[in-house]
Amino acid sequence: MDYKETIELPSTTFPMRASLPENEPKRYEKWREEKVYAKMQKNREGAKECFNLHDGPPYANGHLHIGHALNKILKDTIVKYHYFQGKKVSYVPGWDCHGLPIEQQVEKKLGKEKKDSLPKEKIRELCRAHAAEFIAIQKSEFLELGVVGDFENPYKTMDFPFEAAIYRALCQIAQKGLLAERSKPVYWSWACKTALAEAEVEYQDKVSDSVYVAFPLQKEALERLGVKRAVLVIWTTTPWTLPANVAVALRPKELYVLMSDGKVVAKNLVEKLTALGVVGGSILQEFDSSTLENLLAQNPLNGRDSRIVLGEHVEVSDGTGCVHTAPGHGEDDYRVGLRYNLPVLMPVDDEGRFDETIQRESLLPEADSFVGMHIFEAQKRILGLLGDALLKHTQITHSYPHCWRSHEPVIFRATKQWFVLMDESIQGVGKSLREIALEEIQKTCFYPDHGIKRLGSMIENRPDWCISRQRDWGVPIAFFRDRQSGEMIFDAEVLEHIAGIFEQEGCDAWWSRDNAYLLPASWKNRADSLEKIHHILDVWFDSGSTWKAVLLSSAYEAGNYPASMYLEGSDQHRGWFQSSLLVSCAINHHAPYQSILTHGFTVDEKGEKMSKSKGNVIAPKDVLKEFGSEILRLWVASSDYQSDLKISQNILKQVAENYRKIRNTIRFLLANTNDLERLSPLEDLSEIDRWFMQEARVALEETNALFGRYDFSKGLQEINYFITNALSGIYLDLCKDSLYCDGKNSKTRRASQSAMAYTLRALLATLAPVLTYTVDEALEHAGEVLKGGAQSVFDLVYEPLPLVEAPKVDFVKLEELRAKFFEVVDGLKKEKRLKNTLEVNLLLPPKEEDFGGLAKWMMVSEVLKEAKGEELASFELAGLTYRLLRATLHRCPRCWQFVSPKEETLCERCAGAIG
């Protein structure tokens, strides 16, 4: 008789091959039709806990790159983790729509001349259309990644109500006395003709001129030193700023020396400067820096006075200890200039060219020939004009700030700009914005925790925030100024009237509407006496106001303010995290977030930055086409995202192999629980079942705890270890005999199936945040006992496995016993003395007892107390000897165990199973 038909073989319709690239789009379309995000909200109505992740808006320009995919998948995984823990979650995606990159794309399409000839309203219309086009493109690309959120109602910073909210945030800051217009040096992109914020500056290596220049001391300073001739030696890498020099700064309370060659430098630097050949001879005298304070040197380029001042910013570890000071070209220079009331000379225009100031103020010989010349072009001529005052000229490579868009070196340039003040006391609070922000950072939870120091040090050391830009596409700094008095109009009625217009018409109205229209009735009589400010806001102010425009708006269901989490790349400590913190602290005096999580950047498998020229770019669309988004999602979750993440074809293949193992495990569990209609009572579980349930509970609880700390890679390691060892390595092997050969409804078979069902149910809910598609697919092929009423993945809630009575047997010892046993069996197989373990009976040492399941645990036919049959091998464990004997009974033709009394006769168990 063929007994195959009598065996309960595993069966499932869940396919072994995932065919992810073909099947994922169909599944996501189904989710979209079913409005799963709305379903998620409904499923958690009345939930005790809430979690909202406020989306840092990607820029609405260009297609997605792998960094976007990393960011959105990580956000989606975290939101889903909290959802599957039973919390109400909110995730409203958004887009950053204003700013220079879009304006540059429009200029690229039109050509610069045509763009410059168009009215601002038309340029803004084209920018708006460009942003809308790429929002649609990026939205589609995000959805392909399996990301779930309120994509039907995303936020866009260019929406009219949003622009009004940004403007209202600006007005609130102004009314608190934290906004000021000042002439101050700022990062200036001459290539883009606009001021830049710190977050818009990137540091790159640059080759610069390194020059040491002699500034002769004037009469009173020489008399103070008792000499007839002496020079201060300054060092600079920006010789083009020398025409605007008005001072030389020394370090307070520092010793300076006059050398026998007439040069004055800091004493600490004499040895270094002598080695460089900048100074020579011996020290004639030493004196404190205060000796020369407020006396004069002479600028060798133009003969103008250069006052000697003291500044804490002066370092004596490099340079000369004498710092060339031009308040129009540097933050430190500007600060020391305020203290000494120094003039601010600014001879450079917005394109980085010398203007008529160079001629009017006689800042250079033959000044008229320099007007209109680019500063970097003029530099060589300036060095030539120094003559003997140029003591040494070399070139150095150093890290230098560059514009994030043009990638050209930036300059410091004093212009009239608008600033959010960091150190002004906030009205009614008694603390500065800096103080409040630093306090709020201490209350914020950081992942990784060193983020607290990084953001804190940036806030501690940052200057006032320059929020004005000289461009077209952005929210205007829409204030009126009195033409006669220069008074700024911060009247609440005026500001709110303008905000109301922006809400209805958008902020294009600032350009298209006249003063009378923009003013409330009580102010219309002053329309002709007022002028508009035409700067626009830094885009970081836009994104820094999203908490106000989204979290505090009834237009979005975005959850609470402050948000549970902000999550972005680690570069956003100087970007969005900081701008959001400052805007929120300025207005509401607390942070807009409870926690911040940062991730690293994507690099190739060698750790190198991706670039088209290297040919190492991995595009999300290519990964989806070849592997599917589940593999990309598993790559994100398996990686240590706190560092830079390596990605390549080889790495993705390894991830795909890991996915295959997880999928096959799910498939095996589905196949072996296919006919289970109800869960067995826990008391029916065997010792081995209870051991397995304990192992599963511990592993999945630990995984969920790690996921709760956002340590997904360690959580997945925990799952993989459990699958490889306790589940696939031991339990599934042990259970095959019961599952296939016990009676269909036998207590032992149903108990094992129930242990698997409990485990699979918890495993699916654990994996759901990462492998959402796969879990949803698995549920379609699962029986009702597994589904527990869930129609889709979004109906799941993670519940720990039930607590079972602890096994009475020491399974730690049994695992050691099993490992030692299989070590011996492997040797016997290599010697070809054994084909499989069922040919073996295990003889226990005296006084050792079988707990009733040891034969199953060891996968042998019988466990014996007395020897019978040929001894094949033996081994010792904990001083006890275990013997492997060849089975003496006959092989059952159905279960293949050597337990039948006669050849070709069913064993007692199998005979009962088939009736």
From Swiss-Prot:
Zn(2+) binds at residues 892, 895, 907, 910. Keywords: Aminoacyl-tRNA synthetase, ATP-binding, Cytoplasm, Ligase, Metal-binding, Nucleotide-binding, Protein biosynthesis, Zinc. It catalyses: tRNA(Ile) + L-isoleucine + ATP = L-isoleucyl-tRNA(Ile) + AMP + diphosphate. Gene3D superfamilies: 1.10.730.20, HUPs, Ile-tRNA synthetase CP2 domain-like, Valyl/Leucyl/Isoleucyl-tRNA synthetase, editing domain. L-isoleucyl-5'-AMP binds at residue 568. Its cofactor is Zn(2+). GO terms for biological process: isoleucyl-tRNA aminoacylation. InterPro entries: aa-tRNA-synth_I_CS (IPR001412), aa-tRNA-synth_Ia (IPR002300), Anticodon_Ile_BEm (IPR033708), Ile-tRNA-ligase (IPR002301), Ile-tRNA-ligase_type1 (IPR023585), Ile-tRNA_ligase (IPR050081), M/V/L/I-tRNA-synth_anticd-bd (IPR013155), Rossmann-like_a/b/a_fold (IPR014729). It comes from Wolinella succinogenes (strain ATCC 29543 / DSM 1740 / CCUG 13145 / JCM 31913 / LMG 7466 / NCTC 11488 / FDC 602W). This is Isoleucine--tRNA ligase. Binds 1 zinc ion per subunit. GO terms for molecular function: aminoacyl-tRNA deacylase activity; ATP binding; isoleucine-tRNA ligase activity; tRNA binding; zinc ion binding. PANTHER family: ISOLEUCINE--TRNA LIGASE, MITOCHONDRIAL (PTHR42765:SF1), SOLEUCYL-TRNA SYNTHETASE (PTHR42765). Its main location: cytoplasm. GO terms for cellular component: cytosol. A motif ('KMSKS' region) lies at residues 609-613. Belongs to the class-I aminoacyl-tRNA synthetase family. IleS type 1 subfamily.
